[in-house]
Structure formats: C-alpha cells, structure tokens
C-alpha cells in the first residue's frame, strides 16, 4: 500500500467553509466528550492554582490556535476584575481570528489586540510576544488548548513557543494522553463521527477528489491518532503542467494527533520548561500542563 502524507493543519482552514466545518465538528457530541468536556473539567478543578501562578500583574493572554475564542473565555471569566488583561488570538485562519476577536470584545474585559500577527502560524511567535511586552504588560500567559499541540510535530512547536517566552512567562497546554484505551475510546468515537469525515474530506475535495472516490478511516499508531482516506479507484489529478497518479488502495493521511503516555509527555515538557505541573483526569485520557519558563 502506498501512503501519501499531507497531514498539515495549515490545509484544514484554506477556506471559510473549512474553518466553519471545524467549528461545527467541535459542537458534535463526540468531540465535546473526547476533548472539550475533559479540558473544561480540568480547568475548573485547578483554576485556583492556575490563577495563583498567573499572579496579579497585568497580563497578555496569547491564545495559540484560538479557534473561535471559546477556549479562552473560561480563563477570561475567572480573571475578569482581578487583573488587567490583553487578549491576543493567533490562528492560521483569518475566519477563526475574526470570530475570536468578536467573542472576546463582547465580554468587555480589557484590550483586544488586532495586528498583522493575528493571522499567523506559530513560526512568528517571537514577533508577537516582543510587540506585546510593552508598558505595564510584561507577563504573558500562552494558551495551547484543545489538543492543538498534538496536531503538530511536538518538539518543533515546543521549541518555537519556548523561544518566544520571556522568563516567568506561563503556558497552559491541554492535550490527550495514551491511557492504553485509545483504540476503544477515541478511535471508535472518531470513526463513528460523520462530521469528522465531512470536515477532513474537504481537504481532498479541494485537491480534486470526489467524495465517492475516497473512504474515511481512523487508526492509532506510533503514539498518534491518524485520519486517512483510502482511494477507491485509480485516478489522476492534474494541476498546471503536472499530473499525479493515485491507485486504488493508496492511502492519504490528512491529520494526526499525538497522544503520548503521561511519563513520556512529562519528559518532553521538561526538556523545554523549568517548572512543569501535570494535572491528569482520573482515567488518564487527558492532561492540563501548567509550565513556566
């Protein structure tokens, strides 16, 4: 079997339809159960400790992979009236950034930063944090929630984030873990969620495939959840003066999400941050990591 790997989250949001498709997926009962509810439960359980770490000084909240801003809302609600804050959403999708800016502005809790770096990948983070660290806003709280870290090559993203942080800056990371029940729980849930197929198939449809030429699949291997499509018949796709031949049975990997074992995840975080605390759900399926540089 030939396997083509085009798993790059930049391809998820090339159009507004794709971005909205992801927001629709997030609302599905399966996604709510697998990611959002788990993360919110951990945040609520440990919010006092997180706020203690954040302190009372004015703070920039830098929301990495902001989506429509809802992941940041819970923190901003708790911080409201306690500290001066500025909110800065970062996302590759301009559509997502618009939604996040609008949502947080309506909360009326502090300054919302709109500048050229809002729509950006995570390679430009150093520019972001330097610009924001001005006046009385010397401290940054980075949010990397909703399994966003898992959708990237772990060390590359952690390296970029750490390089953009100043001494004393904090990052909060929400990510799934491998509790040796991923196959029964997450894989099955993802396979049975039609909105996942609807969302990820858009990538291949933009490339020229028809929906009836591909078959959705999910598997867990090498510490990561892979979403892939199997080609159902021979097909050639042409663009400009180039043609690519795909054969029946070929597989195209369109997305991955790393789920490490707790000890392995901890060891990776300790490579980049001096102070790391892991808060883990009782079933060891999800963690909230509070890290300080």
Question: Can you say where each PLM-predicted feature lies in the sequence?
Answer:
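Conserved beta-strand signature within the Rossmann-like core of class I S-adenosyl-L-methionine
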Residues: 165-181
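Rossmann-like AdoMet
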Residues: 1-62, 69-118, 126, 132-138, ...
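Short hydrophobic/aromatic beta-strand or adjacent loop that forms the aromatic wall/cage
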Residues: 224-226, 284-290
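A short, conserved alpha-helix within the catalytic core of class I
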Residues: 150-163
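Substrate-binding/catalytic lobe of Class I Rossmann-like enzymes that use SAM or dcSAM, i.e.
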Residues: 191-273
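Conserved S-adenosyl-L-methionine
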Residues: 274-283
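A conserved beta-strand element that flanks and buttresses the S-adenosyl-L-methionine
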Residues: 143-144
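The AdoMet/dcAdoMet-binding core of the Class I SAM-like
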Residues: 93-95, 183-190
């Amino acid at each position: 079997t030939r396997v083509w790997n085009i798993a790059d989250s930049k391809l998820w949001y090339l159009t507004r339809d794709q971005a909205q498709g992801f927001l629709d997926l997030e609302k599905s009962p399966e996604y709510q159960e697998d990611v959002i509810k788990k993360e919110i439960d951990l945040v609520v359980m440990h919010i006092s400790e997180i706020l203690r770490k954040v302190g009372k000084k004015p703070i920039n909240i830098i929301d990495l992979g902001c989506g429509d801003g809802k992941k940041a809302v819970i923190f901003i609600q708790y911080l409201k009236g306690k500290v001066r804050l500025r909110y800065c959403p970062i996302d590759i999708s301009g559509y997502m950034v618009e939604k996040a800016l609008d949502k947080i502005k309506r909360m009326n809790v502090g300054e919302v930063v709109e500048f050229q770096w809002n729509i950006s990948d995570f390679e430009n983070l150093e520019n972001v944090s330097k610009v924001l660290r001005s006046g009385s806003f010397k401290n940054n709280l980075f949010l990397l929630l909703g399994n966003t870290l898992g959708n990237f090559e772990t060390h590359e993203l952690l390296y970029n984030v750490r390089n953009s942080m100043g001494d004393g800056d904090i990052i909060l990371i929400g990510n799934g873990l491998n509790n040796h029940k991923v196959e029964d729980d997450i894989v099955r849930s993802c396979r049975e969620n039609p909105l996942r197929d609807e969302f990820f198939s858009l990538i291949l449809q933009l490339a020229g495939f028809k929906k009836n030429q591909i078959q959705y699949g999910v598997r867990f291997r090498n510490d990561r959840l892979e979403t892939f499509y199997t080609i159902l018949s021979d097909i050639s796709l042409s663009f400009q003066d180039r043609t690519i031949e795909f054969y029946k049975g070929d597989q195209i990997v369109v997305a991955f999400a790393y789920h490490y074992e707790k000890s392995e995840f901890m060891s990776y975080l300790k490579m980049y941050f001096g102070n790391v605390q892991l808060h883990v759900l009782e079933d060891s399926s999800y963690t909230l990591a509070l890290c300080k540089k």
